Amino acid sequence: MNTEKRAVVLACVTLQFDCDRIIKIAKQIADDTDCDLRVLSVLEPTHDYTEAAWQIEYLNMVSKQFGADMTVLFDKNADRAAAEFAKKNNVVRIVTGLHDGGEESFLVGFNILLPEMPLTMVAKDNMVYSMDAVSYTHLRAHETDSYL
């Protein structure tokens, strides 16, 4: 019996209805790479989630339509929570919205915690940008080879 976990593409979404575009692209990537799809949203702890209920339900419904489970975590540090989730769930790529440019953004923090994790960003106009991790050792080897 094979007990090895399948590789996972992780769609990281916020509570916005238009995050369905992220789930859709993540599903395409998962299918193209023979991976499972998971969806994650990390919410800051609060006492009232009334405003978020519709968005959570909608994104969960979209996740189910694409054959994915959606996990909602409650943590003040979304980047740390997502990185820990990625490590525990055999995630091989994350798919998010575009980086907002701030040094304190989710993507900057996540990249510090898991710099080797390939990343795909989906803009609101559905343009897709991907970055694959390249190790420093690999870069140095190419640099050395090019000067021989």
Each language-model region and where it sits:
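Small/aliphatic-rich secondary-structure junction motif
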Residues: 2-53, 63-64, 89
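Short, charged/polar "capping" segments at the starts of alpha-helices
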Residues: 46-52, 102-104, 129-130
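Aromatic/hydrophobic pocket-lining residues that form π-stacking "cages" and hydrophobic walls in ligand
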Residues: 26, 59, 82, 110, ...
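Short, aromatic/basic amphipathic alpha-helical patches
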Residues: 53-62, 105-113
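Glycine-rich, charge-decorated loop segments at or immediately adjacent to ligand/cofactor-binding or catalytic sites
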Residues: 127-136
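Conserved small/polar residues in nucleotide/adenosyl-binding loops
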Residues: 137-144
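Structural beta-alpha unit
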Residues: 66-94, 100-102, 109, 116, ...
